UniProtKB/Swiss-Prot annotation:
Top enzyme class: ligase
Protein name from the UniProt record: GMP synthase [glutamine-hydrolyzing]
Disulfide bond sites: none
UniProt domain GMPS ATP-PPase: residue ranges: 208-400
Pathway noted in the entry: Purine metabolism; GMP biosynthesis; GMP from XMP (L-Gln route): step 1/1
Pfam family, any one: GATase
Subunit and interaction comment: Homodimer.
General function of this protein: Catalyzes the synthesis of GMP from XMP.
Glutamine amidotransferase type-1 domain span: 8-207
Organism: Shewanella halifaxensis (strain HAW-EB4)
Length: 525
């Protein structure tokens, strides 16, 4: 079996919204990489032993006092280094070049760079050719500051009209800097540049593939678990479903899946989960009906973070209780994925802020009696889905729209009550059904319904009704870090509204959320 971690790239994060995208692009190329905060120690880098290092972008100015710098060891480690945007600027400044603060002449958005000098990074890449026969590249810029003098040993590789050093290189040391963002799709040849860096310049083998990842995960699970038994909280979502299939392959009937019906699931979801994993795949599943327990625990609580923590705590309590029924259950498996780990870790410098606590990594008690098994903690969501397909899970389940770990607990605004959940389930099912019928479901990235704890006057026949309000939410996004509200057809929205008001007794008004992210988040809570 090939070692999927043998060749690897280290990405240092300076705070750019695009940093996770760099990691996903490197993984798509077939090379393992990890994303660390910029303030790592020499010892940590030596221990990781990367084949190459990428310095990512960031929002700060290299010219500002106390702005982040790459560890000096990065440039003495004897491996290729690629600086992107802020990463190029700090590389230049740290190696003896100069960076000047932008004064109203930054570049934001589409730009065309002209390649001046041959470089391993841009080998055989062009989108067009200039009048003088130089390759032109369509790229995406997002910078105010710029390099005004490159370090000794570097050459200017590319320029734009306002940026004389859009790319620089020291081919002897294999140090490269680009002022644009090769990781975004707007940079048309960006993936090829990253391929040149990872596969050719860093000489990494493309071992990071779904079948190899599965094989590696199964071997590691066997080594970690031994003859112990494992309990997994199976929700029917993508992450826990893929964990279930991996563990089933690794340890067979030593896996007990605990499916907790917390009363916060979608319509008929409990029945569907039991049918697929119990009847079809033959997993050992314990079905716990805990609706009242969750609702009682959340009674009177309206604050979103507190609700998330309560839901997480009650889940763990139930797992603890179920584990006591399995004499050898020493492990609790979770569907934690890599973005959860990144966002919850933050930086030692305190520059990362918690926007929402993650269901899988927040709220676990310190005295939890089981060890944690997290076979997906190295993987991005798109990788988890590809692995799920390889393991035989159905496409329509793996590519269903995201559903939050706390479920309807954060889609009912304020205090969660059974009545609200029941109404929301019915309204949401109508919305999703109509999206499928209109062939719109796969054209939006996420769609759902939110219950608003406000009443509104309505008229039904000759009678007046005073009932609840729901909001429809549909967004389009590539990475869920930014999103646009989906411009669904008016007649479609009208049809959904009419069906909900006529078929769901207790809802009198339907509204449509037209907020983007930012400033709003995709979920309301």
């Amino acid at each position: 079996m090939s070692n999927i971690h043998e060749h690897k790239i280290l990405i240092l994060d300076f705070g750019s919204q695009y940093t996770q995208l760099i990691a996903r692009r490197i993984r798509e190329i077939g090379v393992y990489c990890e994303l660390w905060a910029w303030d790592v120690s020499e010892e940590q880098i030596r221990e990781f032993a990367p084949n190459g290092i990428i310095l990512a972008g960031g929002p700060e100015s290299v010219t500002a006092e106390n702005s982040p710098r790459a560890p000096e060891y990065v440039f003495n480690a004897g491996v290729p280094v690629l600086g992107i945007c802020y990463g190029m600027q700090t590389m230049s400044e740290q190696l003896g070049g100069k960076v000047i603060q932008g004064v109203g002449e930054g570049e934001f958005g589409y730009a065309q760079v002209e390649v001046q000098t041959e470089s391993a990074l841009f080998k055989a890449i062009e989108d067009a050719v200039s009048e003088t026969g130089k390759p032109l590249l369509d790229v995406w810029m997002s910078h105010g500051d710029k390099v005004s003098a490159i370090p000794e040993g570097f050459v200017a590789v590319a320029k734009t009209e306002t940026c004389p050093f859009a790319a620089m290189a020291n081919e002897d040391k294999q140090f490269y800097g680009v002022q644009f963002h090769p990781e975004v799709t707007h940079t048309r040849q960006g993936k090829r540049m990253l391929e040149h860096f990872a596969l050719e310049i860093c000489a990494c083998a493309a071992n990071w593939k779904p079948a190899s990842i599965i094989e590696d995960a199964i071997e590691r699970l066997k080594a970690q678990i031994g003859d112990d038994e494992v309990i997994l909280g199976l929700s029917g979502g993508v992450d826990s479903s893929v964990v279930a299939m991996l563990l089933h392959r690794a340890i067979g009937d030593k896996l007990t899946c605990v499916f907790v019906d917390n009363g916060l699931l979608r319509l008929n979801e409990a029945e569907q989960v039991m049918e697929m994993f119990g009847d079809h795949f033959g997993l050992n599943i314990v079905h716990v009906d805990a609706e009242n327990r969750f609702l009682d625990a959340m009674a009177g609580e309206a604050e979103p973070e507190a609700k998330r923590k309560i839901i997480g705590r009650v889940f763990v309590e139930i797992f603890d209780e179920e584990s006591k029924k399995c004499v050898n259950a020493k492990w609790l498996a979770q569907g934690t994925i890599y973005p959860d780990v990144i966002e919850s870790a933050g930086s030692a410098t305190g520059k990362a802020h918690c926007i929402k606590s993650h269901h899988n990594v927040g709220g676990l008690p310190d005295d939890m009696e089981m060890g944690l098994v997290e076979p997906l903690r190295e993987l991005f969501k798109d990788e988890v889905r590809k692995i799920g397909l390889e393991l035989g899970l159905p496409y329509n389940m793996l590519y269903r729209h995201p559903f939050p770990g706390p479920g309807l607990g954060v889609r009912v605004l304020g205090e969660v009550k059974k009545e609200y959940c029941d109404l929301l389930r019915l309204a949401d099912a109508i919305f999703i059904e109509e999206l499928h019928k209109a062939d719109l479901y796969n054209k939006v990235s996420q769609a759902f319904t939110v219950f608003l704890p406000v009443r509104s006057v309505g008229v039904m026949g000759d009678g007046r009704k005073y009932d609840w309000v729901v909001s429809l939410r549909a967004v389009e996004t590539i990475d869920f870090m930014t999103a646009h509200w989906a411009h669904l057809p008016y007649d479609f929205l009208g049809r959904v509204s009419n069906r909900i008001i006529n078929e769901v007794n207790g809802i009198s008004r339907v509204v449509y959320d037209i907020s983007g992210k930012p400033p709003a988040t995709i979920e309301w809570e």
